[in-house]
Amino acid sequence: MTAFVPVSLPSTSALNDAYVKSQLTKWDLLRNLRCVAVRYTKYYHKLQGQELLADLFRDEKVQEAFQVLRKGGAWGQLGGPVTKVDATLLASSLTRMDLFDKLTETSPPIVRSNGDIGKCMEDNREGFQVSDQLRELILVEESEHAALFSEAERDELLWRLFEHVVLGGACCQFEDKVEPYVETSKRLYKELVCAQKDPATGKVQTVSAVYKINSIQGDSGPLELYPSRSRQNFCYAAVDPVRRIVKILYHAYVPYW
């Protein structure tokens, strides 16, 4: 029988880091962000990720620890027995930050050599203000830089986290320079993804499996994960098979109006 035990995040966690918390507060992400760490005892093969997630979210202790934001603004449990978890395995193999080099190497650059983010004509897409070329890259399909990053690159967990911090919450205070976005994305990524050196090759490689939780089913249908629809709603479950820890990173977007 599997035992799941919620544990506290250590003081060294990125979510307890003063810099990260300050940036997430500035971008209006911290107030509706939660991270739950859970130890598990049963061995799961890497192909049994869906089984692990189903067992995880069915566990009573996990259901007590993992809470979601309701429409009224209160936090609460999922509200029913879990019958199925629909999740997508994400790419999380990156061990370097050179993915972001393209932002300065393209012509014209999205990010200038001094780190400044280029500005653009103001627009509004999906409820988000677009006033710089970084947000335009993320939100505007017809942007001249839309093809700069491939679909596979945009599916990488590191890029997903980067998008989340760039877009922020409803009261986000934008950055003029790219560095805070990149640095915070890196720290969150390292929080979720465990890396080890391969003894055979000497190369550093990731060992974690990270899943995007699409929906959680109950007896009578989907259980409500978020108070409203938004691309800034996310729930990631990062499985560290070495230490047998799952970290669930959850955020719910609440519109200002």
Curated annotation (Swiss-Prot):
InterPro entries: CFAP300 (IPR029416). Its main location: cytoplasm. Keywords: Cell projection, Cilium, Cytoplasm, Cytoskeleton, Flagellum. It is found in: Cytoplasm; Cytoplasm, Cytoskeleton, Flagellum axoneme. It comes from the Eukaryota. GO terms for cellular component: cytoplasm; cytoskeleton; motile cilium. It holds the Pfam family CFAP300. Belongs to the CFAP300 family. Cilium- and flagellum-specific protein that plays a role in axonemal structure organization and motility. Plays a role in outer and inner dynein arm assembly. This is Cilia- and flagella-associated protein 300. It comes from Chlamydomonas reinhardtii. The lineage of its organism: Eukaryota, Viridiplantae, Chlorophyta, core chlorophytes, Chlorophyceae.
